Design a protein with these regions (language model features):
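SDR active-site strand-loop-helix element
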Residues: 10, 35, 60-64, 101-106, ...
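Active-site helix of classical SDR
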Residues: 133
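NAD(P)-dependent short-chain dehydrogenase/reductase
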Residues: 139-175
Length: 175
């Protein structure tokens, strides 16, 4: 019998967290814990430590994020709290409890000036508050040898505003 792997997914109400919940039942050897902010506020170090003390978690996929790119320019404090400070808290908890963190990030850590697709080894140059906040969170994860996955324009049919729905909306609004 294979060992059951436990994966904590933060940001369970967001687009990526919701989609991971949709497919979780396909994996019999994985026990998923889907954490919304009400279950686990990753900006609260006490809550994080208590949560991790009570169970063994093999992996944590952090999908929790402040993703309102334009609004982040006006609310940088919240963007940095969620995208960097909270990530730093999560990194500490994962490191203490031997949990491997997979931090979900963004292509906004780059300046967009490349004519070819970016590689993970390319220099970063975040221009926006959102990009800078995500880059700082990446730094916390990478310093402790955790993983970072950079995404761009996630899309899904069932979840809120995303690339697919934005393109459909723009296509119907423009001549």
């Amino acid at each position: 019998m294979n060992k059951l792997i436990t994966i904590l997914v933060t940001g369970a109400k967001g687009q990526l967290g919701s989609e991971l919940q949709e497919i979780a039942s396909r994996y019999e050897n994985i026990h998923f814990i889907f954490a919304t902010k009400s279950l686990l506020d990753i900006s609260n170090t006490t809550a994080l430590n208590d949560f991790f003390k009570n169970q063994t978690i093999d992996f944590c996929i952090n999908t929790a994020a402040y993703t309102a790119v334009d609004h982040a320019e006006k609310d940088s404090e919240t963007a940095f709290l969620i995208n960097s400070t909270a990530v730093g808290n999560l990194v500490k908890a994962c490191s203490i409890h031997n949990t491997k963190l997979i931090q979900i990030s963004t292509d906004f850590v780059f300046d967009g000036k490349n004519d070819v697709p970016y590689k993970e080894t390319d220099p970063t140059n975040a221009l926006s508050v959102y990009g800078k906040s995500k880059l700082k969170g990446e730094g916390f994860a990478l310093k402790q040898n955790h993983m970072v996955i950079r995404t761009s324009w996630l899309y899904s049919y069932s979840y809120g505003n995303n690339f697919l729905k934005t393109m459909i909306r723009l296509g119907t609004e423009r001549d």
